[in-house]
Each structure stands twice: as structure tokens, then as C-alpha cells.
């Protein structure tokens, strides 16, 4: 056997990794993710969950949070934090119907503290601020419209992303179907979710099995995508497992498989780093699910269960060797990877506005700043989407860039939908290309991990950057892919941006430079722990040089490397901190 977790210590390929982390105890004792969540729900003395259940609810798609803006005030009043949960829905490929949309809109309005729907970088939506008495209702509301939140958090395969590309409608549909199949294939098989939230019939856990994930699930979170080149809107290098669609005459014939991407790191710990995924090669369509399971089970058995900071697939590849990991996947899947088929990523932003698909239907991509759908003064965005949902006969597609596409609109309905969108501030011709190419995670006040502002910080920061670009005479198309993430876990995918800000402390960030527009290069830290004012001063100096010294059409990230401002990261383990 190549691995063992006996006697509370982990050995992989003859190497002892150390004692198992406490999360491994928690999963083992959880009775296949049940824990005592059902009992906790009945406890109305506290709005939160006990320590173990606090972790276990993640496997059910929720995080316990509180409002950090009022935490100190509640402490002064001798009150516990305002505990609530954030739920992330499971929506492979991000497709949702108008009927489903109206139901989630109603729930967010009536049963959440913030009244918003948050589109996320995981191509789904989140409810924020749901109090304990409403949690069961939330799951049952979703179930009634065919949605769940199983495995959108925790040590499992998370929501499967798929390129939002309705123009190539036939190819997109095939890719989307594979995203759904992969999601279903890798889902936990436990009945815990149905039992606890949907009042399903209880079963003895001895009758259940987890053939792919195992009874202690994965060492850490696991992220999967299906991507259609030349678009890289899902950011393949942020994910553990990627299926790159290879088409022949518009028909899907197979996938190139990329393994071991990931962006999370820990401040001050050089054993952690963002990493690009490795290309394992091409597979035919019929081997897709076998390969998905083989990658997941290899990571299940070989991933680090002693140190969670080094537990992701990217570290497993660097520890055991990419070739060794790949050979094990081939053995388990009963396949030999073929040479990768050629493809190229050239863009990853959403095409905001109307585009016509090859089927003659039209698709309207709406720019939603930071993905937050709420009714703002003079911009009732959330109401606007609901009004569109009332008349729209196609579907909606959430994007990994936190935007929303109204898809499948007949030509005869275009004017009607555009009128609603414009009346509610969902279409604005004055939004700059720079703003469209900027993104932030949620951070304060709801994310417990946030070290600095992100979503609330970004709008004004982008305005300031727009001013710098204008000052140096740069035209509208010369924008910079700019991302802000409130902590080094990287939900805002700043570690694949041309300018990436990573929260370090309130009002302070690490400034990273050197990513590229296609999302195939990891940026490197340029300045550490500096204020937003200092960041803008640095950007001003850099943009001044870019405007004067760049080559024809040279993007900002490429310029910073060619000019020697920052060193290129080729191999993250070696170069990221060098």
C-alpha cells in the first residue's frame, strides 16, 4: 500500500508526514457529515453552531459568520456576535432558470439580513446573513426549485465551473453537460444533507459508502472546471482539476487535463504559494469521469492530512512529483494520457452587452460590480433582474467574473429586456473597461477570514486607477486586470491578475505584479504591507513608465516583466519567494 493513516499518523510513499490534524478526527467522528447539526439547530440559546458542527456545516454548503462591523458594539452590550450563515449554492456551470431566480430573490429579500444576492467567482450565488431559525427553510426553498448546496464548501469537490460561452451554443451545451456529470459523479453519497435539511428518512451510516471521497473525505478543498478555449473565464490555474475542451468542427472530442492549480497561501509561510496547473495530456470523452475520479482518489490518498496548509493538490504534486502523480492517475483510470492537443487562451473577461449566438438567439451580459445584486439608491439592480426574470423565456448564466448573462433571448424580445435593464441601472454605457476588468472577493463585514477590505474598497480604488490611466494618456482599451482579495486564501483570484492586492491588515495590502491577461502567469510580490495611498503612488509611477516605454500593444503585466520591474514566476515553489 502506498499510503496509511493508522495509529493517528500519515505515511505516503514511505514518507511520514506527521500526526493527523484535528479536522481528520472531526470528519472520522462525524457519522458521514451528520455530527450533531440537527441537535444544534434546536438550540435557540445561541445563534451559532458548536465547534465541530461549525466545521461540518461547510460540507452542507454553509459558513458560520457574523457582522464584523457591529461585533465590538455587541461585545460591549454583553451579547454574542450576530451569528448567521452564508450559503453557497451548487450550480454546475452557473445556469439558473427565471423561475428559480424569482424564488431565490424572494428568499433573499424576506429571510436574509442584507437582502442581497451575491454572485461569486465560483460561478454561483450566495445568500449572506441567514439566521439559524431560517436555515432549514432556506434549504427547503432551494430543494423545491431543484437547487442544493451539497459540497460547495468543505474538504470535497466544490461547485464545478464551466466557461460561460453561449455564442458557441452547441459546444457550450456539451461542455455544460459534462460539468454537471462531473459534479454528480464526485458528490458525497451520504444522505446527511437530505436527512438534516429536507427531513429525509434516516439511514444507518453502516449502509452508506463513499467510494470516491472516502469516509474522511478529501484532505482539503478541491476545485474543478470545464473550460472552452480561447476563453479562460474560469481561471484554470486557480483550480485542482481542469478539463480543457478540445473541439473538432465544433464538436467536442475530448479534453486536455490540467492538474494542480491553486492560489491560496499563508502570509509568512514560504511552504505555501500560488501555483499553475500542470498539463497531463489529452483524454477521449468516454474517459472523463474515470480520470476525474482517479485524480480525486489519488489526492484523497496522497494529500497531506497532517498539515492543512500543505494539503491541496498543488502541494501533493510538488511533494511526490508530477510524473509520479500522473502515473498513479493513469493506473487508477486505466488510461494513458495522449499528447496534449493544441489550444490557446487569449481572453478571460465577459463580453458585456449583447452578443448573437450561432443559433440566432441573443445573449445579454450584464456587468454587476463585485457581483452584489442589491437595490442601491437610483440603481435598483436586484429588482431589475427580478423584472427581467418575470418575462424572460431563456435562462440566466452566472459567470466566474461575478457577472450575469441573460441567455437565449429571441430577437423580438431584445428591446423589452434592454429597456428593463437600462431603467434599473443594469446597463450603463459609462462603465469603463478598467472597471469591467476589476474584481474583489466579499471580505468585510461578513467574511471571518478577511484581513482587509475588498468588495467595499474596490469601487473607489478603481476610480482612482482610472484617473491614473487618464492622466498618462492611455486609451480606454489599455486597461489593467486588477483584483483585490481580502486575505491570502485568494477568493478574488488576485494571484492571476496583472495587479493583485492581497489583504494584510486593515487598510494594508501586499502589492503583486506580473500576471498576464490570459491568466496563465502567477504575479510576484512587489511591495509588502503598504497602504492604499502608497499603492496608488506605486501604480502612478508604473503606469507612467508603461505609457512611455512599452512596445506596440504591450499589456501592463507583460511590460513589468520585460522592463525588469518584477521577475517572472516560472516554477512557483522555486521562484515565488526568490
Swiss-Prot record:
Q: Where is the signal peptide?
A: none
Co-factor(s) = siroheme; [4Fe-4S] cluster
In what pathway does it function? Answer: Sulfur metabolism; hydrogen sulfide biosynthesis; hydrogen sulfide from sulfite (NADPH route): step 1/1
An individual GO BP term: hydrogen sulfide biosynthetic process
The keyword Heme appears for this protein: yes
Q: Which Gene3D superfamilies match?
A: Sulfite Reductase Hemoprotein, domain 1
Per UniProt, [4Fe-4S] cluster binds at 441, 447, 487, 491
- Function according to Swiss-Prot or TrEMBL: Component of the sulfite reductase complex that catalyzes the 6-electron reduction of sulfite to sulfide. This is one of several activities required for the biosynthesis of L-cysteine from sulfate.
Q: Which UniProt keywords apply?
A: 4Fe-4S, Amino-acid biosynthesis, Cysteine biosynthesis, Heme, Iron, Iron-sulfur, Metal-binding, NADP, Oxidoreductase
What's the domain of life for this entry? Bacteria
**Cellular component terms per the entry's GO annotation:** sulfite reductase complex (NADPH)
Q: What family does this belong to?
A: Belongs to the nitrite and sulfite reductase 4Fe-4S domain family.
Q: How is the cofactor bound?
A: Binds 1 siroheme per subunit.
HAMAP family, A to Z: CysI
Q: What class of enzyme is it?
A: oxidoreductase
The protein's name: Sulfite reductase [NADPH] hemoprotein beta-component
State how it assembles: Alpha(8)-beta(8). The alpha component is a flavoprotein, the beta component is a hemoprotein.
Pfam families found in the cross-reference section: NIR_SIR, NIR_SIR_ferr
Which EC number applies? 1.8.1.2
Could you tell me what reaction this enzyme catalyses? hydrogen sulfide + 3 NADP(+) + 3 H2O = sulfite + 3 NADPH + 4 H(+)
Gene Ontology molecular function = 4 iron, 4 sulfur cluster binding; heme binding; metal ion binding; NADP binding; sulfite reductase (ferredoxin) activity; sulfite reductase (NADPH) activity
Positions annotated to bind siroheme: 491
Amino acid at each position: 500500500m502506498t499510503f496509511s493513516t493508522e495509529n493517528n499518523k500519515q505515511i505516503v510513499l514511505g514518507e511520514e508526514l506527521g500526526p493527523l490534524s484535528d479536522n481528520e478526527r472531526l470528519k472520522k467522528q462525524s457519522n458521514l457529515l451528520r455530527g450533531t447539526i440537527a441537535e444544534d439547530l434546536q438550540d435557540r440559546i445561541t445563534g451559532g453552531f458548536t465547534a465541530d458542527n461549525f466545521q461540518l456545516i461547510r460540507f452542507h454548503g454553509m459558513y458560520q459568520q457574523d457582522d464584523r462591523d457591529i461585533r465590538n458594539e455587541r461585545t460591549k452590550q454583553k451579547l454574542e456576535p450576530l451569528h448567521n450563515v452564508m450559503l453557497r449554492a451548487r450550480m454546475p456551470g452557473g445556469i439558473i432558470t427565471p423561475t428559480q431566480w424569482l424564488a431565490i430573490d424572494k428568499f433573499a429579500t424576506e429571510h436574509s439580513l442584507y437582502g442581497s444576492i451575491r454572485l461569486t467567482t465560483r460561478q454561483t450565488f450566495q445568500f449572506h446573513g441567514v439566521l439559524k431559525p431560517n436555515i432549514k427553510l432556506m434549504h427547503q426553498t432551494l430543494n423545491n426549485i431543484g437547487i442544493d448546496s451539497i459540497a460547495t464548501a468543505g474538504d470535497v469537490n466544490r461547485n464545478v465551473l464551466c466557461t460561460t460561452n453561449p455564442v458557441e451554443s452547441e459546444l457550450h451545451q456539451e461542455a455544460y453537460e459534462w460539468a454537471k456529470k462531473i459534479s454528480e459523479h464526485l458528490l458525497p453519497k451520504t444522505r446527511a444533507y437530505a436527512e438534516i435539511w429536507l427531513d429525509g428518512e434516516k439511514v444507518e451510516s453502516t449502509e452508506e459508502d463513499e467510494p470516491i471521497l472516502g469516509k474522511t473525505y478529501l484532505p482539503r478543498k478541491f476545485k474543478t472546471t470545464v473550460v472552452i478555449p480561447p476563453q479562460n473565464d474560469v481561471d484554470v490555474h486557480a483550480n485542482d482539476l481542469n478539463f480543457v475542451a478540445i473541439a473538432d468542427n465544433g464538436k467536442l472530442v475530448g479534453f486536455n487535463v490540467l492538474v494542480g492549480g491553486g492560489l491560496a497561501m499563508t502570509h509568512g509561510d514560504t511552504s505555501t504559494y500560488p501555483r499553475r496547473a500542470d498539463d497531463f495530456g489529452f483524454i477521449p470523452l468516454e474517459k472523463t469521469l474515470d480520470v476525474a475520479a482517479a485524480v480525486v482518489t489519488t489526492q484523497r490518498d496522497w494529500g497531506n492530512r497532517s498539515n492543512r496548509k500543505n494539503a491541496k493538490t498543488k502541494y501533493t504534486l510538488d511533494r511526490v512529483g508530477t510524473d509520479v502523480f500522473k502515473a498513479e492517475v493513469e493506473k487508477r483510470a486505466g488510461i494513458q494520457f495522449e499528447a496534449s492537443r493544441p489550444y490557446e487562451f487569449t481572453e478571460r473577461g465577459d463580453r458585456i452587452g449583447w452578443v448573437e449566438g450561432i443559433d440566432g438567439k441573443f445573449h445579454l451580459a450584464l456587468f454587476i460590480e463585485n457581483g452584489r445584486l442589491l437595490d442601491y439608491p437610483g440603481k435598483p439592480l436586484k429588482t431589475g433582474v427580478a423584472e427581467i426574470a418575470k418575462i424572460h423565456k431563456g435562462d440566466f448564466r452566472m459567470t466566474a467574473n461575478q457577472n450575469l448573462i441573460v441567455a437565449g433571448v429571441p430577437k423580438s424580445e431584445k428591446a423589452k429586456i434592454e429597456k428593463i435593464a437600462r431603467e434599473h441601472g443594469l446597463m450603463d454605457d459609462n462603465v469603463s473597461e478598467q472597471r469591467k476588468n476589476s474584481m474583489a472577493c466579499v471580505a468585510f463585514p461578513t467574511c471571518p477570514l478577511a484581513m482587509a477590505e475588498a468588495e467595499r474598497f474596490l469601487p473607489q480604488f478603481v476610480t482612482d486607477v482610472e484617473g491614473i490611466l487618464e492622466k498618462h494618456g492611455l486609451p480606454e482599451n489599455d486597461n489593467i486586470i486588477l483584483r483585490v482579495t481580502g486575505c491570502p486564501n485568494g477568493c478574488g483570484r488576485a494571484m492571476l491578475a496583472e495587479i493583485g492586492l492581497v489583504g494584510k491588515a486593515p487598510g494594508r495590502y501586499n502589492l503583486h505584479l506580473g500576471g498576464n491577461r490570459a491568466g496563465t502567469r502567477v504575479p510576484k510580490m512587489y511591495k509588502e504591507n503598504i497602504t492604499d495611498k502608497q499603492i496608488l503612488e506605486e501604480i502612478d509611477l508604473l503606469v507612467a513608465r508603461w505609457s512611455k516605454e512599452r512596445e506596440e500593444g504591450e499589456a501592463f503585466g507583460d511590460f513589468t516583466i520585460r522592463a525588469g520591474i518584477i521577475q517572472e514566476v516560472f516554477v512557483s515553489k522555486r521562484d515565488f519567494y526568490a
